[in-house]
Structure formats: C-alpha cells, structure tokens
From Swiss-Prot:
The record marks S192 as: Important for substrate specificity. Its EC number is 2.3.1.31. Its main location: cytoplasm. The keyword Transferase applies. The gene is metAA. The keyword Acyltransferase applies. It is an enzyme of class 2 (transferase). It comes from Phocaeicola vulgatus (strain ATCC 8482 / DSM 1447 / JCM 5826 / CCUG 4940 / NBRC 14291 / NCTC 11154) (Bacteroides vulgatus). Belongs to the MetA family. The active site is at C142, H235, E237. This is Homoserine O-acetyltransferase. Pathway: Amino-acid biosynthesis; L-methionine biosynthesis via de novo pathway; O-acetyl-L-homoserine from L-homoserine: step 1/1. Transfers an acetyl group from acetyl-CoA to L-homoserine, forming acetyl-L-homoserine. Keywords: Acyltransferase, Amino-acid biosynthesis, Cytoplasm, Methionine biosynthesis, Transferase.
Length: 305
C-alpha cells in the first residue's frame, strides 16, 4: 500500500529502509483517487516508535491511506520532542469537524489508575463518543480497549497479581469473520499489561461479541456494532524488540519484572526474540482496512454517520 504520510515524518525514512512503500503529501496529491483517511490517537509515551510500528502494519494492501495524528489538549507528552508534536499532531478540537474512514486509539501507561482519575478522561471519552458518528471503524488497543469497554458498556477491569508479559497463544471463537481471514487456528500475540477484563463481563453485554481469546492471557478481542468497533487487549503492532526494551528497562530500574514468556530463543534473554506474531499482525490490520474500512466506508466521506 502506498502510505500518504506528512512530509518529513521520521517513520518515512525508517520504513523506506525496510522496503515499505511510502509517499509524502506532495506526491500523493498528484494521484487522482480518494485515499482512505485514517486518524491515529497516539497515547503511548514513545510516540515516534508507536507511529512507526502502526504505519508498518498499515502498509500491506494496495489501498492509499492518508494518515493523520491526533493529540489530547488536556495532556502534554513528556517523552517526545515538542517540535515533533507541533509538526505532526493536531488537537482534537481542530479535527472534530472532520470525518475519517478509520481510527486507531492506542494504549497508555495509566492502566493501574481508576479511569476517572486519568487527567484526560473527560476529553478521551468525548473522542470515543465522537468516533461513533465520525469514523467508519475504530480499533481500540490495550488500555484504550479497556477504557472503551468501560465507557460504552460498563465492563470493569481487574488488577493482575503479576504483569501479563510475553507472547501468548490465542484462538478464534467466531469463525468466518473477515477480520480473521487467513488466520491459523491458533495465533500468537504480545501482551504487556497489569490489568485484565473478564470474559464473563463481556458475555453479559448483548451488544458485544467475544471473538478471540487465550487460555493463558484471557480476553483478546471483542467486536461491537458489526465491526465498527474492535477492542483489542494485546499488542499485535509491537516490533520484535519492544518487550526486550521494556524488560531491560524495568530490570535497570530495579522494578519487579519477570522475563517475558515465550519470547527469547531458549528462554535466554541473551538471545534474540523469536517473532511468532508478525504474520497475524499484518493480517489483522490488512483485514481491518479492507473489510471494515474500505468495503464499508462511503465514497462521499461526509456520509459517515
């Protein structure tokens, strides 16, 4: 897929080195087609890393995408250069009159706080509500998935005794859904979280379908509104060394952390990770773009309701 990204976004050069086809705005404007408009609300601390991880996975269909990045007015990022935020991110207030074919809302390092204590809770729930009438399909990832399920359906989260950390085996509960087209019977997903949601709470809500889960890591994906919303508790977008970085960071800080499970070759942190999730991560995002965004969105984007 040719990705239409803001000129000079750092991810452009990083992904070109991986032989991924990206174009900047100036080249895209010469192509006489309507690109799909995708907005990413990036709540992760290391924003450039997350941008690159997501854009990498959005690059595997023949569709042209126009990627925009949203930020919160009520929260200031402390780990990303101000110049980068000014150059590539826009406040929700400046974007709220736009319509988008797809939206991705990332995780955030606030999962151990009560939702209402998060300093941007009011703003982000406003965005959740806005997305229902301004976006064709939205992916909620990790904390955003928990927060969305709580906001819309009252599904609570629960603290874990030990961090869910590693690569876990999953299975599909609902066969035949386009989001899983091409998936194997079992597939692997990275998880890195201190809280969980319980399948029993999902099953109580008639508007939700629990479509994939793990015997080890629990709920993985719930779907609502016929695919206009997906709530995903894992991190299929993670690059090979993300868990390694988290593990060694916490070790260096003296924090209690177990080695990520099913991750390093021979369970030896001196060895490289064994990537078991790349294929299904690519399928997940390409299936979402094709079947739930491109196939469902109106040509006249203003008709999104």
């Amino acid at each position: 897929m040719p990705l239409n990204l803001p000129d000079k976004l750092p991810a452009i050069e990083l992904l070109k080195e991986e032989n991924i086809f990206v174009i900047d705005n100036s080249r895209a404007s010469a192509q006489d087609i309507r690109p799909l408009k995708i907005v990413i609300l990036n709540l992760m601390p290391l924003k450039i890393t997350t941008e690159t991880d997501l854009v990498r996975l959005l690059s595997n269909t023949p569709l042209q995408l126009e990627i925009s990045f949203m930020k919160l007015k009520s929260h200031t990022s402390k780990n990303t250069p101000v110049e980068h935020m000014k150059a590539f991110y826009h406040d929700f207030d400046l974007m709220r009159d736009e319509k988008y074919d797809g939206m991705i809302i990332t995780g955030a390092p606030v999962e151990q706080m009560p939702y209402e204590d998060v300093n941007y809770w009011d703003e982000i729930t406003t965005i959740f509500d806005w997305a229902r009438t301004h976006v064709t399909s939205t992916l909620y990832i990790c904390w955003a998935a928990q927060a969305g399920l709580y906001h819309f359906y009252g599904v609570p989260k629960y603290p874990l005794k030990q961090k869910m950390f590693g690569i876990f085996r999953h299975h599909i509960n609902v066969q035949g859904l386009p989001i899983f087209r091409g998936f194997d019977d079992e597939f692997f997903v990275p998880h890195s979280r201190h809280t969980e949601i319980h399948r029993e709470d999902i099953l109580k809500v008639k508007e939700l379908a629990l479509i994939a889960e793990s015997d080890e890591s629990g709920v993985y994906m719930a779907m609502a509104r016929n695919g206009r919303e997906f709530f995903i508790t894992g991190h299929s977008e993670y690059s090979p060394y993300t868990l390694d970085t988290e593990y060694k960071r916490d070790l260096a800080k003296g924090l209690p952390i177990e080695m990520p499970v099913n991750y390093y070759k021979d369970d030896n942190p001196d060895n490289a990770p064994v990537v078991r999730w790349r294929g299904h991560a690519n399928l997940l995002f390409s299936n979402w773009l094709n079947y739930y965004v491109y196939q469902e969105t109106p040509f006249d984007i203003n008709q999104i309701r």
